[in-house]
Structures are given as structure tokens and as C-alpha cells.
Amino acid sequence: MLGSHNLRNYDPTLLLYTFGAMFSAFASAYRYTVWLQRPPTRVYWRRGWQLAFRRPEVRRTLLTLAGALGGNFVAQNFIRRRGWSRWVAHLCMSWGTLLAGAVALPLVFGWIHFESEANAPQVYQVLVFGVRIGAFHTESSWLRYMFFNLLNLSAVLVIIGVGLTLHRRLKEAGVIAVQQFGNDLVPLLLLLAVSATGLMLTVSMHALHGEGYVVISLIHAVTVIAMLLYVPFGKLFHIFQRPLHLGVTLYKQANAAAPPAVCSLCGEGFAGAMHVEDLKGVLAEVGLDWRLRGPVAHYMHVCPRCRRRQVGIWHGQAMMGQAKSTGD
């Protein structure tokens, strides 16, 4: 009811989409809450907010967040490092999906709608939450073309991305060996089905004069609802997890700038002190007690090189003890 003027701007024919979207939203929120309760995730979440609001370094924090937002979310450079085809595929799928959601969800709930002007029926008003933000002519306006084809554009982007990804998943032996049908292929097939049936609606309306429109619209509704129901339980859920990487970026930056933790054996720095202390807390929360007897209080106070050396020493001592007992 919020933003739709007590459902005055709501289209009852979209009821199934509404229930699917609401279920997906509540299920995703529940899973996200459970996910945040995991000790490692909770540490990143808490530290991310703490670092974001550090008063002496607000400007630096904002610049870091802006860079991470542009590099990891807009340009998605973390995928480009794995190959250009994967980068293009992920870029098309992610932006196509986000664009479709940004357009479809407000339309479903009545937050955005169009009305003809009273004195000029050929002019459409664009209303967001009941507030007029613009207007365009229905016959000769590039705004009309843009507004009415945003979902088609998003469908084309998603189909390109899904096609490239399916080609990789069906051709590369290394990918085939580790992929799972439910986790890797089902989301791609759902995205493809939603996008293809959405484009078929446009083809039916403009090229076939409405032939088969009702059947295609029902199939499209089924595919959309199936995808919405899949989101909280499958791979598409990482859409909501990915923004936490902004906090991880701040965490890595803070660890790199702070003095490192010092190894209790060799005296050299090896990792961020904050990271070591947080890791000790996480290990304790999950029931792993890595405290040691002797000069070293905790296993996490030992650098990786000394850990490998200690393992060799312990193995040697164990073998010598076994040989001695055998000789006796």
C-alpha cells in the first residue's frame, strides 16, 4: 500500500507477481539475517560499520568506498581478472537483472505508473509515488521509446550474458567437472526463460498482432515467479551478499595501514593485528581452542613460516620418540 495511494495505482492482474516478490523478499531477508549471525560474517559486518564511521578518516573512507563501488560493482573488475568473456557475461547478466528489477518491481507495486493528461491524452505523465516527475508524447518521443523498452533492453543483456556463460559451462572440461546443476545451471536457465518469454511478449504484441499473447504471458508469469522463489535459496542470493564486500575493502585497507602482528617465535610481522585478534575470536566462537602452553600463548601468534617449521620439528620429535620406544 505504501507509495501506491492505498492500492489505487495497483494493477490486480499482477497479484501473482506481488506474492512472488513478497515471498522472495521475506525469505531473502530471513536468510540474510541468518547469514549475518555466522561468526566470520558478523565480524566483517561489525568492523565494516566501525571503519566506515571513523571520524578522523571520513574523507579517506568515502574515497575508498567510491573506488570500491566503481571498480567492484559498476565495472566489476574482480571478474575481468578471470577473463574477458567471463567479464562481459557477468556484466551483461548483472546489469540486465538489476535494470529489470529496478523497472519491474516499482511497476508491480504501483510505485511508478503512467497517466494521460486530462487536456492532452497523447501526453503521458510519469508518476513516482504519486508525484509527477515528467511527461512525454506517446507518438514521437525518445523518452517513450526508452521507457517502454527498458525491460526489452534488460532481457537482451541477460540473454547475451547467459549465452556466454552457458557456452563456457558446457564446453570447458574444468568447469563441467565441478559445476552442479541446481546451483550453477538452474539460475542460468531461469534467467534465460524469463528474458526469452519477456521478449516474446513484445514480439507477439508488435509483430503478431497479439497472437498467443495470453499463453505467453502465463508462461512468462510462471518463469518469473519460479525465479523469485529460487532467489533466496540459490546462487542468485549473492546479489544481496555482494555489497558486504565494501566493508571487506575497508577492513583490508585498515589492516594494511596498521602495524602488523608480530610472530612470537621469530619476531617478524606477518599479518594485520586486528585481523589476528578477530580470527582468534571467531575460532573461539566456533569451538576451536588453539591456545598453547609455553612461551607462545596462541597458535595465531605464529607466522605461517614458523608454523611450517614447527610442524617439521614436531614430526621429527614424534618420529624420534617412536624410534626410541621401538628400540627399548
Q: Where in this protein do the model-derived segments appear?
A:
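Short cysteine/histidine-rich metal-coordination sites, predominantly Zn2+-binding motifs
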Residues: 247, 278-289, 319-328
